[in-house]
Amino acid sequence: MKVTTEKKPRSILELTVELDKQQIEKALDRAARRMSQKYNIPGFRKGKAPRFIVENYFGREALLEEASDDLIQKAFQDALKQEGIEPYAQAHLTDVNLTEAPYRFTVEVPVAPTVVLPDYRAIHVPLEIEEVTDETVNHAMEIRRDRHVVLRALDEPRPAQPGDQLTVQIETFVDGEPLNPRAEGEDIPQSTLVLDPERIVPGLYEALVGVSPNTMVDVTVRMSDDHENERVRGRDVRFVVNVLDVQERLLPEWDELPALENFEGTLDELREKTRNELIEAARKNAEDDVFVEYVRQVIAATTFDLPDALIVREADSILREREAEFERYGISAEQIYAAQGKKRDDLIEELKPVAEERAKRGLVLREIAKAEGLAPDESEIAREVEDIVASMEEERRDSARTLLETELRPFVVAGIVDRKLRRRILAIATGDPSFEQAASPEAASEPESADGGEAQTVDTHIDSAPVDDVSTKQAASPEAASEPESADGGEAQTVDTHINSAPVDDVSTETPIVSQEENGESVENQSVVDVATPEARTE
């Protein structure tokens, strides 16, 4: 058997296998025996007709057809072993000739992606930390205070005053057309607005001051030239607002704030704590910006050759994540697809560009981790396990330790590599070796932002990469253990090395609509224009 290979784009290896006549004849013998056992041949009991009788009765072409599948599959497996080829996904038969010499067939075999990093250590990104001013601290303190507001119904109806909270129904129009059309008979959803010039776009705010409940406000506002929504940028937008209710917002006195925040200290000490949190958050945001920009530049300078199967797998992983989000809200994926008038395969196809970018990012991070030798040693893994179990109830520690040291060991390794990789990239990008100083898992946890919400984080995990010796999935709790995941974020799976003549299936979905609050619950925003000011959105 002679095997030749040719490298083709998209990580495809074209494998041509040439068979000798002896292999063909043996395969025909086996096929004849099978056919004589399956079919009635006049003058012979089943399984007793010799090959030449079977061939004369059914024809050589039928015999070849019976023989070809087993012959090709066996020869293909032998060729893979002979050449040391590990398929990344199912192979595809593209050409077959078993009727005359030379007997051969051609298979396209997806192989692991090729990633050639640039001189990534020559890429640098400055660390630019935003200054925390007194004004910034004042704003954060106002947010703290605002969290403890009490809403009170008005004793007597009166016009809305600055600081009040309005319950409204809003419709928005551009050029006379609604920005988000509703189905016939569908009610306009209710939402709430705080009557504050820093929270509502100019023009609309002024129109709402002084309105009474059960009043309609119809106002046209020129949106800013730099508005984040390009559909309304620099254009006139008509707002039709039905004011349903006006409530008074009662803010606590400043000296009550420490107790309300469960803070043991004075107001000045709470203010200082807030400043420190803002400084820490500003540094964290700057580090995130460096990380994102550095990885972007490395990706742009990296040479990739990715198999289509990797992109499809990544797209499927993204779609599974979104389906899980729908399920959490009691909505089945089938309901979403039906509403969109799309099939799952259509969505996967749409997701491919996003999936390819995510795959590239994961592969680049994986290759940097490998090049930098960030795989942890046994002592690091042991320390990580002990740090994790130390936070658990004592009676659960022994079982958790056993699980972390066995089934969940890859996740433990992943958490270590994630942190080391982030610090190494920041050190390379900024030229500041202090980022390499060891940090405990507790120190690596994300700080709470000064406004009380969780600090925004940048995902530094290595996803979208084929299974490798450097895994960087985030460490999971023992309770989260179930089926192992592959390093590309999907379920672990074995590669079918059989040949398939059909192409690999391909999948995408759109980002969910921006939501706003309706009676305290998140709902789909009926307007694509955000009535909030940029400052309010940062809260």
Curated annotation (Swiss-Prot):
Gene Ontology biological process terms from the UniProt entry: 'de novo' cotranslational protein folding; cell division; chaperone-mediated protein folding; protein transport; protein unfolding
Comp. bias regions, Low complexity: 434-447, 475-484
Enzyme Commission code(s) on record: 5.2.1.8
Organism domain of life: Bacteria
Domain PPIase FKBP-type: 163-252
Keywords for this protein: Cell cycle, Cell division, Chaperone, Cytoplasm, Isomerase, Rotamase
Region (Disordered): 434-539
Pfam families (UniProt xref): Trigger_C (PF05698), Trigger_N (PF05697)
Keyword Cell cycle among UniProt keywords: yes
Zinc as UniProt keyword: no
Single annotated GO MF: protein folding chaperone
Cystine pairs: none
Reactions catalysed, as given in the entry: [protein]-peptidylproline (omega=180) = [protein]-peptidylproline (omega=0)
InterPro entries reported in the protein's UniProt record: PPIase_dom_sf, Trig_fac, Trigger_fac_C, Trigger_fac_C_sf, Trigger_fac_ribosome-bd_bac, Trigger_fac_ribosome-bd_sf, Trigger_fact/SurA_dom_sf
EC class: isomerase
Cellular component terms per the entry's GO annotation: cytoplasm
Family to which the UniProt record says this protein belongs: Belongs to the FKBP-type PPIase family. Tig subfamily.
Domain notes: Consists of 3 domains; the N-terminus binds the ribosome, the middle domain has PPIase activity, while the C-terminus has intrinsic chaperone activity on its own.
Function text: Involved in protein export. Acts as a chaperone by maintaining the newly synthesized protein in an open conformation. Functions as a peptidyl-prolyl cis-trans isomerase.
Protein name stated in the entry: Trigger factor
